[in-house]
Design a protein with these regions (language model features):
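Extracellular/lumenal and peripheral-membrane lipid-interaction modules
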Residues: 2-298
Length: 298
């Protein structure tokens, strides 16, 4: 009789396990998870993203994502730790910590690859304490960062001697190293004056969020003909050491930054050297990183 009783108990346990496994399989097959992120704590060293995963239904399993690493352009830029899914819970929360310095290094690699790279998440975890989960997810990323300066135009101004007009700044990436990112530009100039303008110097600055992020200089002297056009070649160096502060400030301001471009030409007019400050260009740069991230993860 005792053997029969034990058999019935084992049969009930087996039935429960079977039903649980069947429900778990059905749940996982029909699962439509949604991931939502929002900005958390931000400073010049780290950026925190509060991440919530909604499963749409209670999960009959206890899952612990021990660590999920975020890679950009092959460089680890952040880690999501201790994302736990409780038994029969329909959501889970965690914090993704991004390292600003590593983000800048990944940006350099992204540019080296022609502004093409992959964003990848590598995760490992356990179910009911058993470390059996391991997987990855990646999405391609393409940008066109130089378009922000390549299409810059500045009208001529002044009375007796007018400042040259800028009719574009086609640019390309140059040297990229630990000291910064180099941008090489061809400044298209038009001289509206009846006399030629020998150009022997350019002061070129880009400020963002109150920080000087880049400055440029003339590579070689050029003469802009009277009532004609010419091209001035300039080299701009982006200070990557300051970028973590700019990134943090941009996020703190709701992903909104004021960017100012200042350009002064050093020319010679009637054998007299003089500087010609051009009108400043101010632009508001807005991003929607969180929105794009949520769309990519949903």
């Amino acid at each position: 009789m005792r053997a029969v009783g034990i058999g019935k108990v084992l049969g009930v346990i087996g039935l429960i396990v079977f039903l649980w496994a069947a429900y778990l399989g059905y749940t996982l097959i029909t699962l439509t998870p949604q991931i939502r992120a929002e900005w958390g704590y931000v400073d010049e060293k780290t950026i925190e993203l509060d991440v919530t995963v909604y499963f749409g239904k209670p999960l009959p399993v206890s899952i612990n994502i021990e660590e999920a690493d975020l890679y950009w352009a092959g460089i680890k830029v952040g880690t999501l730790k201790d994302l736990k899914v409780g038994f029969l819970k329909d959501s889970a929360r965690g914090v993704l910590v991004l390292k600003n310095k590593e983000i800048v290094e990944a940006l350099k690699e992204h540019i080296r690859n022609g502004e093409q790279s992959n964003i990848e998440i590598q995760a490992r975890g356990s179910i009911f304490g058993i470390p059996i989960m391991r997987g990855s997810f990646s999405k391609p990323l393409e940008t066109d960062l130089l378009s922000y300066i390549s299409n810059i135009t500045i009208e001529s101004s002044g009375d007796l001697i007018k400042t040259p007009a800028i009719e574009g700044m086609p640019s390309k990436w140059g040297k990229i190293d630990e000291n910064g990112i180099e941008i090489l530009s061809d400044v298209k100039l038009y001289n509206p004056n009846p006399v030629p303008l020998p150009l022997f110097g350019i002061k070129y600055y880009i400020d963002a969020c109150g920080y000087r992020v880049a400055q440029g200089e003339l590579i070689e002297k050029v003469v802009i003909p009277a009532n004609g056009g010419g091209t001035a070649k300039i080299r701009t160096i982006v200070d990557t050491d300051i970028l973590p502060k700019v990134i943090a400030e941009h996020i703190k301001k709701g992903e909104r930054s004021e960017v100012t471009l200042k350009l002064t030409l050093a020319v010679k007019v009637l054998n007299r050297e003089m500087e010609m400050p051009l009108p400043e260009i101010k632009k508001t740069v807005e991003t929607n990183i969180i929105e794009q991230l949520n769309l990519a993860l949903s």
